[in-house]
Amino acid sequence: MIFNASQDSKTEIEYQTISSTQTYLAEEQSERLHNLISKEQLEKLNQAFNERPDSQVGFDDLRGLLLEQDITFNDAVYNRLFLKINQNRDFMVDWNEFVSYLIFGFQEEDPSSQKESLILPISVAPSVRKTEHRSTVCCVALLKAKSDQVPIEEVTETVNFSFGGEDSPEASGMWVTASHEGMLRFWTSHMEPIRTATSESSKPHAVYCMSYAFYNNGKVHSKLVLGDYAGNVRILSYSPNLRGPFQAKPGAALIEVVWADVLKGKIPQMIPKEYINLHNEMISCVHYSLHMNALFATAEYRNTKKYRGRCPGMIMVTYDERSNFRVPLGVSTFFVAESHNIVVTGGPDTFVRIWDVYIPTEPSAILTGHNGGIVMVFVQPEENKVYSVDYQKIIKVWDLQEHTLLQTYGELVRLIHPSETDMTYFYHSHLRELIVAGRKLISIKCCPRVRVDLTDGNTHAAPVSVVLYNRLFRNIVTCGLDSYIIVWDPWSGRRKIIMKNCHTKMIYGEIIDIEITAATFDPLEQFLLTGARDGTLKIWNYNNAVVVRNMSIMPDQEVTSVIWVVDRILAMGWDRQVTEFNDVEGREYGDPKKWSKFHTDDITCADVKLGEGVVTATYSGEVIFWKLETGQPYRRYSVMDPTRFIELKLTPEEEKLMRRSKRLMSRLGSSRMSRATAITMPKADDGRDYGQNVPISVQAVLFLQTRPQTIQHGSVFISLDTGYIQKVYSHHSRGGYMSQFLSVHKTGDCVLTMCTDRKNRYIYTGTAFGYIKVWHIVNYPEAEKVHVCMPRLRLEFIFMRKEFWVTRAKRVVRHQREPLLVSSYKAHLKAINSIAFINLPKIVFRGSHDYSCRLWTQGGRYLGTLGTVLPWSKLSPFERAGSENQVYRLPPDIKKVASSTTLKVISGVQMDRPAKRAEVKAPEDRDEETAQTDDGYDLKKIFDKPLKEPILGKHFTLPGKSVMDQRIDVDTTQSYIAVYTHLKVHHTEMLERLPTPAVISRVAGENYMDHYVPVEGKVDLSGSALNIKQPPRRNVRPNDPRNMRMAKTRGDMGPGPSPSQQSE
């Protein structure tokens, strides 16, 4: 490709890229100009620029200035260097452009750009469960298996990934929760209950906070720090060797220690130390740093009239030397980051302060933004993040170096009742989880590590929509539905530039990110053009993240495809037409040109052949070819009836529809037409140009750039949602449809994206189910016969090697001679949205709906995922990627679902021949003869000896069926099947009633009134008995012997209670 520098200049710049058409460069020459220029050379170049007219130099002049400073490049490298420097595209370089290029080179090497996160620190939904305590949890602790403090000689480089073993109790420990009634509950790291216990203790002053410091090696004495309500701090020091003073004693299930005995030295294993009245108020938080051999203790001083803001909020004690960190109102909580030698404090004054431990007079930074007192702070030193929680349950995340706010998390306000104010917090530094305890247990993951046993990491925070390779800068550009544009260096795996919030829209005062749906480069690949879902387009200088130009096709109409040719930009999407923008200097901001609107549905995809034509396809299966120079359509097809000629004119119904849609759009303004309305406009029974009633949508189109525009050469591939790829015979004005082939092997799958190599020998397809297929299309169509070396293809593509059974991918195409399927494997778990190919190193990379962009060799070997936390395999743009001696691994997510074909292709390993079983011999001959097969496999070494009966051992045998199953002949002569007529229905019988026992019958016939005698009584409190007084009878006979006998009995009893009453 050769582009003229300008119309007024005769200078021509040859744009050479690293491709199969360029000669191989034996030695890579660096284009990093900032590494080659010294300070003296830069001053001389500045003087030379100032001596030039207008302080500008041309193509040859700049090369001469560099030669004067002994900086030389060959022709190919200098061409690329000049295009990188010339950002104004006028082929004249001024001093600002030259210095900007040097600055960009230093920015690419800045390691801070690698640590910028794509997602918010707290982006995972919290887990909530009940505490199972009778009252509110007042304390949460962690039974640690590993210490957070590590000796300096054992400090290693921190990594941001894990292998999944940190969830075990041996690595993460157990949680312990306590409530006011003395109940203790033990939990696993996943908050599953283990057991329950109770605890009681007594001290002269109640202990309010504790801290425990220890090393894993056990060479340093462990420290147990106690802070009480009186402002005292006590330290217990003991050796952890052989469990120290906590050794089990025979006959004692529980070891009790009295503090007075510890002070008197009766327990020699424990060394106490007291700091009486270290603070005048209650100790709020304590910590002992073994690395600095220092004690930190804080207290709150809320009585401003008494202390007048001169209170020592935090005191650091080192070898009996005290350092006072004065904070108004005191300190409620703090966190010591020993790796950074800083202390982060928070208190009732709503400020988060960052201190240097050796400068107590003034904080290094003050973070403001909370509306309530700070109750919890902690630091992630490896991530350079500070987390703070206030009294109103709002979590804020800060950058430790730049002291900026990263995130405000308010989900706790919704999960916790407003009446719950005294919450307990604990941060698990190993699992990176924040535990919030009250009436509920809430676990919040704070910037969790990547589980490399489950995934290699993500490239974007949302599905990747477009991937591109820039041949000028030799980097990969990915665009996602998260509205991010990221520039990657594929040779080192580094992230060079990240641009966030690229397309935005304000809705009700809130800025909303708009998804990026299309992207491409300019012809010289200096600028990037992106299209979004709301119809906006932007031109980016993606080296400095600057927007050069803003455009739009139609409000709220998604851009599905963009094309950038010389002096023109073409955009198409849901507005059903092609919009042309000028790219000529001086005419950039004029009104765009609208091509004729012949499509009746939304445009889904488009492609261009430079200098010849453009092809567009719609959701309803329409395909139209356009002249690139004039924008006039010359051929129209329908994929449902591709051989039928369709005249390029609108029918009366379509003209009426167009006029109606124009009126509707003029009335609604920026309102968006739904896709369903656009599809249901044509009548279902009118199939003149649309084939069947159900439309077939076009998913992707691909132009073969090396195929000439003749009737005999096919040049366009069209992918349908049915899984087929139709081959349009030619984009010639008299060309037509030729053939089609099945491109998937699973029902419901279809090709979503396609690309090809520079010479159009292979076509790479990505499907909706995540499969990658490589097709050899040199002899497709069959009229163009070229000799193909099949052994060479088998060496490169292991998929083509013979197997003992035909796999599913091969069974589908076993009767299809052309095109030849050379590779097929599963690359992603979700749909593949975009695919691209790097020619010289033979690398294929894809952007998927699973948030990742992965690099593969042409043969199917896995190279890596952009944005991974694992080490990157070194690649070169001048050498072919992959070697036969290299061991390749599988992506962790693919490894769990991979088929035998995918495992063979990705690993590159295939068993030559399976083990054959020996022929069946008589039982007496088996022990004498060997079971050696023809292939050299010894089955006796594999299986040892034949299994003996019973193979399953002693087990329960199911009883046999008592009756045979009755065969049911279903009557299918009627319009429905009477199923109930064939069912066995057993009539119910009355159960025999058992006779009632005589005792129960006698009890049931009794009347409790027969045993009832009304009495009058009152309670005698002195004697704790009842004085019963029977009611008088109606007919009292004085001479009745029964009355005389009753009176005599009463006289004998006297006033005291009877023995029977006492017993009662």
From Swiss-Prot:
Cited SMART domains: WD40
Source superkingdom: Eukaryota
Ranges: WD repeats: 153-197, 326-365, 369-408, 459-498, 511-550, 598-638, 746-785, 827-866
Biased composition (Acidic residues): 925-935
Region (Disordered): 914-935, 1023-1064
Keywords: Repeat, WD repeat
Pfam families with a match to the protein in the record: WD40
Compositionally biased tracts (Basic and acidic residues): 914-924
InterPro entries reported in the protein's UniProt record: EF-hand-dom_pair, WD-EF-hand_domain, WD40/YVTN_repeat-like_dom_sf, WD40_repeat_dom_sf, WD40_rpt
Coiled coil: none
UniProt protein name: WD repeat-containing protein on Y chromosome
Organism whose genome encodes this protein: Drosophila pseudoobscura pseudoobscura
Species classification: Eukaryota, Metazoa, Ecdysozoa, Arthropoda, Hexapoda
